[in-house]
Amino acid sequence: MQLTLTLSRASGMQLFLLVSSLLLWEKVASKPTAIVSTDDLYHCLVEQSHNTFIMAADVYREFDINFAKRSWMKDRILPLCHTASIHTPENLEEVHEMKTEDFLNSIINVSVSWKEPLKHLVVCSDCSSGASVSMGKKAVDMKDKNLIILEGLQTLYNRTQAKVEENFENFDYPAWSGLKDLDSSDEEHHLFAICNLCRCVKRDIHKIDTYLKVLRCRVVFKNECGVSTF
């Protein structure tokens, strides 16, 4: 018996975009980022950042469902994220005024600020009672993808500079000081710290995703695209 698979036009386009994305990522992943074209690097970083944001949103949603509705959690005031001091554009006027290299610098500062916290989020996801296996896996994937994004961002940034930066020592990123609360033996302090971490990583990865799309529009498409997030 012959089976015929019929795809709607919309489904066929989604499949085409998915396959194209995978092929592009395989093409880039098979090369050192230093020899990947700027256009391809932007396309792949946007794909990576968008997927990472989806995972961050899923992790935050799961935490919210499992933990955040506890009565004591509702009475607490959420503190500022540790990246709040990093200057990033907040409206279209600031976006247009910011130079590409300064834009990349800001995004790198946000991304590198999450290297250490994401390591600890992975540990907490594995050891927290009530956290699913899926939540732990997504935390690991977020940590790994952030490093991939960071490597690509550094490559793009270096292409705007006369002097190549080999590491992040010259970037002005804020230190994270939330480990004490995260390691607290008090369950309320511990869970509240995880809640804040999940909330902030979702917020910041959304920023990275949005800003990469803005820069891709500027650099790759010469501003001939619609980015209306601001």
Curated annotation (Swiss-Prot):
UniProt keyword terms in alphabetical order: Disulfide bond, Glycoprotein, Hormone, Secreted, Signal
PROSITE patterns given in the database record: SOMATOTROPIN_1, SOMATOTROPIN_2
The keyword Magnesium appears for this protein: no
CDD domains the record matches: prolactin_like
Record-annotated disulphide pairs: C81-C200, C217-C225
Annotated glycosylation sites: N109, N158
Subcellular locations according to the entry: Secreted
Protein family membership: Belongs to the somatotropin/prolactin family.
Protein name per UniProt: Prolactin-3D1
Organism: Rattus norvegicus
